[in-house]
């Protein structure tokens, strides 16, 4: 009997997963719009989502080129703690980057004044370094230092974790950001300064039983979304997971067979690449096919520079179908048209991709809300299944 009890406890321990609840909040874009600042922001900042994946120049060893405009539309945020005792921060869990950074008490910029700031002197486990970090965006850059401390995430105590502490945050637009910092979940190969990403550090310490994490994004206005470290919860999806090999280990990049509408190819006719990115809100692709899609769905530009459609037309619009590894993944108009403040905004966004990189798409939250997603580091693959 004792052995049966022991075996049962071992089996239970192997099934333990760590969930981080995500809360859906108003995006930075919406905050700027409500304060009458969006048009001016878009005018001053040459916003190209591709800059997240294709920095204009190779960065020095301790520089992280991570344009912050890419988080303009983010709505899902979770809480982590850093230090002993823990200091709480609201962060984006971003599979499109690999570094962790938060504001620090050394930052006196306007953008830092209304956000949580890490104080190293209040943590008994903080270790300083001589490293620096610079996170470029728009016309300025966020600069800071690198340090080590314990990170609390989903009930996990991730010790000796390297992270960035911002010292300057130029640009008043970050004042309206609904998040404090970023927690990157991509591969270590794209991590600035060779810093070990949070999930890698967690796995290396044996704090999760499986070398994978998964994401469920709810369409609910407030709650229900989660990041799951070390496991998969089948209650979040229907059917079975379909697995797609990672084509390039850096971002969570996969191969796409085609993108169709009404049975006809509208992009990616010869196959293309896509990055599955929780740190991008929209469905993003090369400028030309995106322009064609906007035209096909009847989208036109409003005074804020957003592409909008008639809300009454949504029910008559077709699905956009991504065929990946032989499986069709339809995205219905109810998913790719975003309703906000009485407007219906297209969930597609164009980006200027370097021509030598081929046709690249970003499958952001518009896609992930439809499909429970598993990021499997052990087997370098992505699992997809329709959400429950």
Curated annotation (Swiss-Prot):
Keywords: Aspartyl protease, Digestion, Disulfide bond, Hydrolase, Phosphoprotein, Protease, Secreted, Signal, Zymogen. The modification Phosphoserine is found at residue 130. Pfam families: A1_Propeptide, Asp. Residues 76-385 form the Peptidase A1 domain. Its EC number is 3.4.23.1. This is Pepsin A-2/A-3. Its main location: secreted. It catalyses: Preferential cleavage: hydrophobic, preferably aromatic, residues in P1 and P1' positions. Cleaves 1-Phe-|-Val-2, 4-Gln-|-His-5, 13-Glu-|-Ala-14, 14-Ala-|-Leu-15, 15-Leu-|-Tyr-16, 16-Tyr-|-Leu-17, 23-Gly-|-Phe-24, 24-Phe-|-Phe-25 and 25-Phe-|-Tyr-26 bonds in the B chain of insulin. One of its GO terms (biological process) is proteolysis. The expression of pepsinogen genes is regulated by hormones and related substances. One of its GO terms (cellular component) is extracellular exosome. Gene3D superfamilies: 6.10.140.60, Acid Proteases. Residues 1-15 form the signal peptide. It is found in: Secreted. Each pepsinogen is converted to corresponding pepsin at pH 2.0 in part as a result of the release of a 47 AA activation segment and in part as a result of stepwise proteolytic cleavage via an intermediate form(s). GO terms for molecular function: aspartic-type endopeptidase activity. Belongs to the peptidase A1 family. Disulfide bonds join 107-112, 268-272, 311-344. Residues 16-40, 41-62 form a propeptide. The active site is at residues 94, 277. CDD domains: pepsin_A.
